[in-house]
Amino acid sequence: MANDLFVKDALFNQASPSQVAPRLLFIPVSGTYGMGEYARSLAIARAASRRWQHAAIHFVLSREAPYATGAPYPATLLPSSPTFHSVAVIELIEKWRPDVVIFDNAGRTAQMRAALRSGARVVYISARRRQRRKAFRWHWMRLIDEHWIAYPEFIAGSLSLSERLKLGLAGRPEVRYLDVILSRVLPGQREAILSRAGCDAGTFVLVVPGGGTGHPGADHAVEQFMSAARALAASGVPTVYVGPVNATSAAGTAKDSGPGAHSIDAATLNWHPLGPVPQADLAELMRSARLIIANGGSTLLQAVACGSACIAVPIAKDQGERTRRCVAAGVAVAAARDSASMVQAADRLLQDETQRVALAGRAARLGLADGVEVALQSLARLLKTARHAAPP
């Protein structure tokens, strides 16, 4: 029956088993805080499962990560980030025999060598300068088939002279910029998403602090974002909040019950907390927002890729430089990590339509690539040259 299915699709007529039912192993750095690497790997995994319906996908995660137990794919859970558990990672690679192993800001030399010995192709994703430097070490360049730089070139920087010389001499790996990981909903779902938000397109401010896992030195960042969102709502601005919502804030959103329900104030009418939402839904909200207040991480670049006017608020150590580059490119304005600064920046843009529209226009003209599609095309090329057929 499986062979009959393959024949029905002309694309797979000459395909090897690994091209039709690839085994993809994702190893993102993971731990008690931050989830950018996991979110990126998950978006690629979901897209891969749609492209290759028979794909086998497996994750390796820290059991301390707040998202670990809710992962939608089979996962091997380790005491901490996979980088620190080479014995377990190597054992999994040797037993499971993936076609491609994707290390996202994680991995050790021994783990990559094990992947090569098993016949797998190796992808390394770097999201920080330190990891990028590691990927350009001579012994890693011989192990990596593709090096994906997680951010756009204007953020991550062009290849240096040294990097270009090394690539010329080594002849590998292939280097690609992922630009932005931006999931998409199915056609026709936009109206349903806006209906759940309770706002029309182009009318609301979207406030997104990020994944909600606390970065060192960023204590109370979520509370500051939420406070800013509530203040904007109280001033009469329709405000959609996507992120962690505590019980106190949720209780303050009640729109009915009680003798005073008929006199709902502006803050309640304009306050639309959604809690966490799927990435694809968030992207649709970004495309529909009048203005976005976001952290300085991947969320900021997603907002820019959606062609939206954006206020960037760095909440982690590595987000400051990213924010500065976006400001320098004229695609975002910056605000400090306190609610008053966020509200002040939002008020200025909401009252200056010319500046807001110009900001959004420059963001749209960047034309950032869809990193998920870049990743899928690269995986398809790697699978064509897989050095072994996936086991049954």
Predicted regions and their residues:
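A short, well-ordered alpha-helix in the C-terminal region of glycosyltransferases
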Residues: 355-369
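Conserved catalytic-core segment of nucleotide-activated headgroup transferases in glycan assembly
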Residues: 40, 44, 186, 196, ...
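Acidic donor-binding loop of glycosyltransferase active sites
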Residues: 287-294
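Catalytic binding pocket for nucleotide-activated donors in carbohydrate/polymer assembly enzymes
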Residues: 300-344
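Active-site and donor-binding regions of nucleotide-sugar-utilizing enzymes
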Residues: 27-51, 59-168
